[in-house]
Design a protein with these regions (language model features):
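Gly/Pro-rich turn-and-neighbor structural signature
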Residues: 2-18, 23-27, 65, 220-234, ...
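Extended, hydrophobic/aromatic-rich amphipathic alpha-helical segments that build helical scaffolds
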Residues: 2-16, 123-131, 148-149, 153-158
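Long, K/E/R/D-enriched contiguous segments that form extended
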Residues: 14, 20-49, 53-55
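Secondary-structure transition/capping motifs at alpha-helix termini
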Residues: 15-20, 133-145, 157-170, 279-282
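Short, glycine/acidic-rich hinge or "gate" loops at secondary-structure transitions
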Residues: 20-29, 143-146, 163-174, 221-228
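Active-site core of glycosidic bond-cleaving carbohydrate-active enzymes
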Residues: 44-48, 55-80, 88-91, 101, ...
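Acidic/histidine-rich catalytic neighborhood
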Residues: 153-215
Length: 305
């Protein structure tokens, strides 16, 4: 039964990831209505990335090609997004949602919650799918022609997006930021979504910079750029452990409005990234364990699967 379930998962990805530039969306091929839930688009604050986690490890690397086409389109629209929404003239970025036309701008109808609409990290996270493809296949031509240019463009934006921490100028943080679809409560009872220096943002940037450096090294190019990325990487604000022994999600040790919310984006460093481990960072690994204990286990999908 377990093998059947495993192969069923592979089948779902195979059947819905065959068209260049059109990866598996939120509903796959079998939507029950003309207007699919969440418009049948691509949520890139976890869903699209998670769809492709099994592609390489279950020997389906060719299924990543549709993601390549989508990201290439997003890099084009994402430059406009970076310039006109964020005032940054270098690189590209994307919000938390895209579609078959590679939309990259912040989403919503003008009165949506910033907990998911005010997020600029989608592109930086999604290009890790491309890096994973290179990491598994070691296809140097793919790295040179596809993955690295898109990763570098995402880095260009993030280098401009980072600011010095006003409380510790030696460190770099993002501002503004959110932790996707989550809200906090301050010590004074204020409820909000946007702040600065969120854990998820910095985990994504940490992974992006680290892997882009590796890509440049593999290609033997951009040595000065590698130095710049490494310098910024070393200045990123580190992980912090909260008063409950949990991994802090926010810059300050604030409570979540919903401790059992399904999104646990601040655990990205644990998985799918490997910045936190029992072997290398036991204190942070224990804090991640405590976070999961607090959050509970009430589903089998993101983020509590």
């Amino acid at each position: 039964l377990e093998m059947l379930y495993f192969q069923y998962g592979r089948y779902l990805l195979i059947s819905s990831s065959r068209t260049n530039g059109v990866p598996a969306n939120l509903q796959g091929l079998w939507a029950p209505a003309l207007k699919s839930p969440w418009r049948g688009n691509y949520t890139i604050n976890i869903n699209l990335e998670e769809n492709y986690w099994p592609a390489e490890s279950t020997n389906l690397p060719e299924l990543v090609m549709p993601v390549d086409g989508l990201v290439k389109g997003m890099a084009v629209t994402g430059r406009h997004n970076a310039q006109h929404f964020y005032g940054i003239n270098k690189g590209w970025c994307a919000g938390h949602n895209t579609d078959a036309w590679a939309m990259s701008n912040p989403v919503g109808t003008g009165n949506e919650s910033p907990q998911w609409s005010n997020w600029a990290m989608g592109g930086a996270w999604l290009v890790q799918t491309l890096w994973d493809h290179y990491d598994y296949t070691r296809d140097i031509n793919y790295l040179r022609d596809t993955a690295y240019p898109l990763m570098k463009g995402a880095c260009d934006f993030m280098l401009e997006w980072l600011i010095e921490d006003p409380h510790n100028p030696a460190q770099l943080i993002t501002a503004p930021c959110t932790s996707p679809e989550a809200d906090y409560i301050t010590d004074k009872g204020y409820r909000g979504s946007s702040l600065y220096g969120g854990t998820a943002d910095l985990a994504i940037i940490r992974e992006l910079f680290k892997n882009t450096i590796k890509g440049a090294q593999a290609l033997g190019i951009d040595k000065d750029y590698q130095v710049r990325l490494q310098s910024s990487l070393e200045r990123l604000r580190p992980y912090h452990i909260g008063k409950r022994g949990n991994l802090m999600e926010w810059y300050h040790d604030w409570d979540d409005q919903d401790w059992h919310h399904r999104h646990q984006s601040h655990l990205l460093g644990l998985y799918p990234f490997h910045q936190i481990s029992l072997a290398q960072t036991p204190d942070l690994a224990q804090a991640a364990t405590k976070t999961l204990e607090i959050k509970g286990d009430k589903s089998t999908g993101w983020s509590t699967g």
